[in-house]
Design a protein with these regions (language model features):
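Sec-dependent N-terminal signal peptides of Gram-positive bacterial secreted proteins and lipoproteins
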Residues: 2-24
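Active-site-adjacent loops and short helices of periplasmic peptidoglycan-processing enzymes
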Residues: 23-166
Length: 170
């Protein structure tokens, strides 16, 4: 029994004395074109790489579309898809083949956006919430400013490429 206690105490001491804290000797390897790590409380930048370089946000745009839609509608609302919403897409754009006049709940529309990357659902939700895609994009840009995303500018609700559609890590 004494041997067990001695072994337990020896292991505990070994664990306590064996612990060593250290800090990274080299910067992490980041393959992204731009990146930033900040301390949330102080705002101090701990790591940066091309933080003000404009990048194409692609489908990250859909996260902002969903956020603005959720804040300005109810999940139970019905979205009626216009011809413009479902046909105003570039060839090969991701879609779930919503038809003009088709009705989906806001909740189902958001699932289509976030899970299926449905570009026509982004357009339909934008029209439903703000009356037009352009009005909705203005709401997205306002929300970006409110969140401190000063290097971000949206030009559409779905993230398809446009030259004035960009974001930065900072």
């Amino acid at each position: 029994m004494k041997k067990r206690y001695a072994a337990l105490i020896f292991c505990a001491i070994g664990l306590l004395l064996g612990s060593v804290t250290s800090e990274a000797k080299k910067k992490p390897s980041v393959t992204a074109e731009s990146a930033i790590v900040m301390d949330v409380q102080s705002g101090a930048i701990l790591y940066e790489k091309n933080i003000d370089k404009r990048e194409y946000p692609a489908s990250i745009t859909k996260v902002m579309t969903a956020l603005v839609a959720i804040e300005n509608s109810s999940l139970s609302e019905t979205v009626t898809y216009s011809r413009n919403a479902v046909t105003n897409l570039e060839s090969g754009a991701s879609n779930i083949e919503i038809q003009p006049g088709e009705k989906l709940s806001m909740e189902d529309s958001l699932y289509a956006i976030l899970l299926m990357s449905a570009n026509e659902a982004c357009n339909g939700v934008a029209e439903h919430v703000a009356g037009s895609i352009d009005n909705f994009v203005a709401m997205m840009n306002q929300k970006a400013k409110e969140l401190g995303c000063t290097g971000t500018h949206f030009a559409n609700a779905n993230g398809l490429w446009m030259s004035n559609h960009y974001t930065t890590a900072h």
